[in-house]
């Protein structure tokens, strides 16, 4: 039977991956929801207007939306299907994307209900990353602890 930590990581990875594939697809194409796609286009236009530096770098609202959508789809697929270290990399990239999205929402003055999802999924991504990293650090700590105990035992003087 799998450990609770493993079950948690797998469940979070799968759920978060599917969510980001879905949301990224909405940003890229109107096939899933025309209304949501139109809303995304409108929102990204306001983000691009609020950051004139993007325009100076040649990043239009369309390009920004497509970059973020592609990152979400790609990293969502990795979180859902790819085992091992690439999941942590995808998790970190998505966490950075969520921070950028929160920044954009704050920049344009959106109310909390417009960006609550980004806040919640940013927290979930952080939790998933912390749990995954904690699971990897534990064997190393135990090995170091055993080495310290062995070193202490060697330094003890036997009294007989």
Curated annotation (Swiss-Prot):
GO biological-process terms attached to the record: chaperone-mediated protein complex assembly; positive regulation of protein localization to cell surface
Membrane-side (Lumenal) residue stretches: 27-61, 110-113
Chief localization: membrane
Parts of the chain on the Cytoplasmic side: 1-5, 83-88, 132-160
Record carries keyword NAD: no
Keyword annotations: Chaperone, Cytoplasmic vesicle, Endoplasmic reticulum, Membrane, Peroxisome, Transmembrane, Transmembrane helix
InterPro entries: TMEM35A/B (IPR040399)
Stretches for region Disordered: 137-160
Transmembrane feature ranges: 6-26, 62-82, 89-109, 114-131
Membrane topology: Multi-pass membrane protein
The keyword Cytoplasm is assigned to this record: no
GO MF term list: acetylcholine receptor regulator activity
Locations listed in the record: Peroxisome membrane; Cytoplasmic vesicle; Endoplasmic reticulum membrane
Any one of the GO CC terms: endoplasmic reticulum membrane
Function comment: Molecular chaperone which mediates the proper assembly and functional expression of the nicotinic acetylcholine receptors (nAChRs) throughout the brain. Essential for the proper folding, assembly, function and surface trafficking of alpha-7 (CHRNA7), alpha-4-beta-2, alpha-3-beta-2 and alpha-3-beta-4 receptors.
Family: Belongs to the DoxX family.
Protein name as catalogued: Novel acetylcholine receptor chaperone
The encoding gene: tmem35a
């Amino acid at each position: 039977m799998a450990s609770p930590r493993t079950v948690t990581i797998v469940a979070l990875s799968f759920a978060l991956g599917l969510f980001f594939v879905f949301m990224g697809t909405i940003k890229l194409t109107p096939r899933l929801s025309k209304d949501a796609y139109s809303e995304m286009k409108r929102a990204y236009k306001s983000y691009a207007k609020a950051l004139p530096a993007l325009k100076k770098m040649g990043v239009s609202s369309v390009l920004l939306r497509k970059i973020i959508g592609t990152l979400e789809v790609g990293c969502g697929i990795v979180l859902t299907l790819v085992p091992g270290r690439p999941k942590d990399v995808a998790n970190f990239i998505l966490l950075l994307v969520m921070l950028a999205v929160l920044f954009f929402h704050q920049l344009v003055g959106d109310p909390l209900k417009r960006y609550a999802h980004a806040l919640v999924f940013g927290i979930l991504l952080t939790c998933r990353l912390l749990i995954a990293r904690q699971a990897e650090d534990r064997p190393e700590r135990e090995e170091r602890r055993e080495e310290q105990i062995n070193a202490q035992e060697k330094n003890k003087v036997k009294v007989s």
